[in-house]
Amino acid sequence: MSILSIVLTGFGLAMDAFAVSVAKGITLTRVKAKDALKVALFFGGFQALMPLIGWGAGRYFADYIKAFDHWIAFILLGFIGGKMIFEALKEDDEEKAEVAVSMEVSKNKEREFANMKRKEELSAKNLTVLAIATSIDALAVGVSFAFLGISIVQTIIIIGIITFVLCFLGVIIGEKLGDIFKNYAEIVGGVILILIGINILLEHTGIIEKLFS
C-alpha cells in the first residue's frame, strides 16, 4: 500500500469525524480555538488508536486468511464506504428539519440554551462517545492493514494528523457556513474508501499488472 493510498484512506476515514465536527460548529456559538482544538484532539486520537487495535486483531488471524486477505480488505472498505454514502443521503432531510426547528428559538432562550449546549457538546463524555462512534470504521480498516504489510506506526500517525486537521477546520467551518458541507463530506469519504478497496483488490489479483503489461 503506497503512501498516497494511506493518505487517501486517512481522508476517507476522517470524513465521518469531519462531518460531526462541522455539526459541532453548527451547534456551538462563538467558537473559540480551544473548542476546535479539543474536538480535534479527541477525534484525531481515537482515529489513530482504532486502526492500531484493528491491526493487532488482524495480525492474530493473518496466517489463517492470507489466501483471501485482499478480498477481506475490499469487502470491508466497500461496505464501510457504501454505509457512509447511504447514511449521508438518508439523514439529509432529517437534519435539515432539525436545523429549521432550532432557527425558531427566540433570541434570549437561544443564548441561555447555547451556554448549556456548549458545556454538554464539549464534555469529555460526549466527545469520547462521538470519537468512538466515528472511528469504528477505522477499527475495521485497521484489520485490513494487517494483511497489507504496511508500517502501522507511520499509518496511524498519518491518519491521526489528517483527522486532527480536518476536525479542527470542521468546527470552524460549521460555525461559519452551517451544514452545507456535512453530508457531502460523508459521501466523498465513502467514495474514497470504495475506490481504495477496488484498488487493493486489483493490485493483489494482478489485474492492474496485466492491463499495463
From Swiss-Prot:
Q: What is the membrane topology here?
A: Multi-pass membrane protein
What keywords does the record list, in alphabetical order?
Answer: Cell membrane, Ion transport, Manganese, Membrane, Transmembrane, Transmembrane helix, Transport
What is one term from the GO cellular component aspect held by the record?
A: plasma membrane
Query: Which residue ranges does UniProt annotate as crossing the membrane?
Result: 3-23, 36-56, 67-87, 130-150, 152-172, 187-207
Determine if Nucleotidyltransferase is one of this entry's keywords. no
Checking HAMAP family in the record gives: MntP_pump
Q: Species lineage, top-down?
A: Bacteria, Bacillati, Bacillota, Clostridia, Eubacteriales
Which species expresses this protein natively? Clostridium perfringens (strain ATCC 13124 / DSM 756 / JCM 1290 / NCIMB 6125 / NCTC 8237 / Type A)
The protein's name is Putative manganese efflux pump MntP
Q: Does the keyword Cell inner membrane apply?
A: no
